[in-house]
């Protein structure tokens, strides 16, 4: 029953429902992992800027919104990639795309274009260091920069680096 519901949700591109069904089943030790991680296409370039790989963008979407296009966070972030409206407006201008707050929660391609473009910009800002770009995407670059200046991030990075060796 759960696999059928998750499969139907996937077929009609309601990945958020497929994830919810799979999560409920996994709590009861019935796993339907192929529905927990939907696959859809993401842009390779947005106005000339190369975007990180499809799987990476999908992992951000999975974590941020669980593929719920209409997701709205308590902080005000919107859509699949959970963009703050002000950030989305700035990114739309940088990417030479029209800004529309309503499209953040109604147009998956638009939300993914803006979110991908924004993430790639953060990746450039942090010299290709994915953990920093991910942290900046999640908490905001100002917050991350403050933490870097406090040496907290350097200490955590050193521990992570030693652990990976």
Language-model features and meaning:
Residues 1-165:
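Catalytic glycan-binding domains that act on GlcNAc-containing polysaccharides
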